[in-house]
Amino acid sequence: MNGKKLYISDVTLRDGMHAIRHQYSLAQVQQIAGALDKAGVDSIEVAHGDGLQGSSFNYGFGAHSDIAWIEAAAEAVSQAKIATLLLPGIGTLHDLKAAYQAGARVVRVATHCSEADVAAQHIAFARELGMDTVGFLMMSHMISPQALAQQALKMESYGATCIYVVDSGGAMNMNDIRDRFRALKAVLKPETATGMHAHHNLSLGVANSIAAVEEGCDRIDASLAGMGAGAGNAPLEVFIAAADKLGWQHGTDLYALMNAADDLVRPLQDRPVRVDRETLALGYAGVYSSFLRHSEAAAERYGLSAVDILVELGKRRMVGGQEDMIVDVALDLLNRNK
């Protein structure tokens, strides 16, 4: 660590959207953003769970527009930067500009780990706007560390100044994380920062984040009470407690985060964010964490087991954006069971 301060990136108000089907009220966004700001996090990501313009039949409709959520969060903070997420093909340059005007100053441009080339235009435009521009390689477990590094290089060449390893399926262990950070560090410019976005489906969210920092990672994504897709993200308050024990500088108030997690965030969960039969299946099968609620709904509709649906999705190597295939898989399983 050599005494450097970690950049703490909170994702409660973006990844956490998945946990409550994108239904945060504006008052809740203000309350949570205000608490995170006071606790000293560096950035607070705000958007529909699937990024700008994610509100749709495919992903689920949000209670409010991204812009309304971003404006609400921006009003509530005085120190932290407001971040947002953009998936090229869902969000457009127009949406990014609107988010910037609403107060977002950091953007994470997210692609499937093997499709960095679709982000060129969006990354370049974000840099033109003067945003802190991050490349976000989702489902990083699905390709080799060396292949991931080549995709990271592409994002760097388009203008991203930080590249994230994103364990969207919560499917990786500490060795997987080390291998990927070593591969990235071997090819990226020394001034290009790196980040880690973990999911807790195998209960390794915090351990994987620690392994990333040990490999030189600069930014850590985490959320209050782990609020996020699947079994959630690395729980922010737990990661900070562990970082404290390791003597790492993080600049946040642990007790303020603990209070925000239990007083503000946990009560909002209509389905507990935890490792259980279904979320463990996500991590074990390497499935996109936000498929959880969609798969549970399909299982209920067709009288199937959500685990069976998730395992089949894993076998078919489905990735984010293929939510419409969940019903297809359910119908195939129904026919198979006849």
Curated annotation (Swiss-Prot):
Q: Give the binding site residues for Mn(2+).
A: 15, 197, 199
The name this protein carries in UniProt is 4-hydroxy-2-oxovalerate aldolase
Query: What GO biological process term is on the record, naming one?
Result: 3-phenylpropionate catabolic process
Role of this protein: Catalyzes the retro-aldol cleavage of 4-hydroxy-2-oxopentanoate to pyruvate and acetaldehyde. Is involved in the meta-cleavage pathway for the degradation of aromatic compounds.
Task: From the UniProt record, list the reaction(s) this protein catalyses.
Answer: (S)-4-hydroxy-2-oxopentanoate = acetaldehyde + pyruvate
- Species annotation: Klebsiella pneumoniae (strain 342)
* Keywords, sorted A to Z: Aromatic hydrocarbons catabolism, Lyase, Manganese, Metal-binding
Keyword tRNA processing on entry: no
The record's annotation in SUPFAM superfamilies points to:
Aldolase, post-HMGL domain-like
| Active site annotation, chain numbering | 18
Q: Which residues form the Pyruvate carboxyltransferase domain?
A: 6-258
Alphabetized NCBIfam families for the sequence: 4OH_2_O_val_ald, PRK08195.1
The encoding gene? mhpE
Family that this chain belongs to? Belongs to the 4-hydroxy-2-oxovalerate aldolase family.
The pathway is: Aromatic compound metabolism; 3-phenylpropanoate degradation
Amino-acid positions noted as binding substrate in the UniProt annotation, renumbered to this chain: 14-15, 168, 197, 288
Please provide, alphabetically and separated by semicolons, the GO molecular function terms listed in this UniProt record: 2-isopropylmalate synthase activity; 4-hydroxy-2-oxovalerate aldolase activity; manganese ion binding
Under Enzyme Commission nomenclature, its number is 4.1.3.39
Q: Which residues carry the site feature described as Transition state stabilizer? A: 14
Subunit structure, per the record? Interacts with MhpF.
Which Pfam families is this protein grouped with? DmpG_comm (PF07836), HMGL-like (PF00682)
